[in-house]
């Protein structure tokens, strides 16, 4: 997953960076860094994002 894909997914789910961070168990600043290519998007992130997407943002 690319930084742009991460941001697009977050926005499609209607989540703020803070809300996504909470669901991923990371800091909001880390989400920002991942969306801007300053931190790697890990396999763990991808697995959790697929679960969030499957379950919906509610």
Feature map (PLM): residue ranges:
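Residue-level detection of the helix-turn-helix DNA-binding "recognition helix"
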Residues: 11, 25, 36-38
């Amino acid at each position: 997953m690319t930084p742009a894909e991460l941001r697009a997914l977050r926005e499609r789910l209607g989540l703020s960076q803070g809300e996504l961070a909470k669901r991923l168990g990371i800091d909001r600043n880390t989400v920002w860094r991942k969306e801007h290519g300053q931190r790697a998007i890990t396999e763990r992130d991808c697995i959790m994002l697929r679960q969030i997407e499957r379950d919906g943002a509610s």
